[in-house]
Amino acid sequence: MRKNGSRCLKRSKKRCASKRKPAFSIRDTASFVCSAPNKEEKSDMSLKLHIVLFEPEIPQNTGNIARTCACIGATLHLVEPLGFRPSERNLKRAGLDYWDDVKIVHHASTKAFLDEHSADNLYFFTGQAERSYAEVDYAGEVFLVFGRESRGIDPEILERFAARCVRIPMKEGLRSLNLSNAAAIGAYEALRQNGFSGLV
């Protein structure tokens, strides 16, 4: 009788153990793989995204960025002087038929733009920054600022706004990513943090 009783006890313990929730499961890893916040978390600070190009030189890049802005609902800011005419064929071709769906704001100079906007809303993308673009908490009205393809953002501006500078990590020894790719990377990180609100 004792042997049978001990067997029953062991079986009941096994059943209980099988019903217990494991301390860690594969599902739990989801929070480590992608930590995008719930949409409700930033509902009081809905993202208003702007992409700013300081004196862009290559029309195809600007056209591609305009298309990205149209697809994500961002405003595109073009800061003069531009390295091309607004009627440039390559500019229109790169943006395809998305031009009617993007809001574009022109600024006479970098000074005019900087005088008009608070530094608290600006993030300057440069390879000289120490902080990664992914370490920033993007909320509210956000301006992602990019410099010229050939020289980037002027050193005096980077020095003035050193605390607002971020970089996109890349392999050591190489100069930079393509401008339109960099703009898309920065924009989609801001959108990811806000649960891609408004997108499908």
Residue ranges and their predicted role:
Residues 5, 9-10, 19, 27-200:
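Post-transcriptional modification and biogenesis factors for structured RNAs
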Residues 22:
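Acidic/His-rich, metal-assisted hydrolase cores and their charged scaffolds
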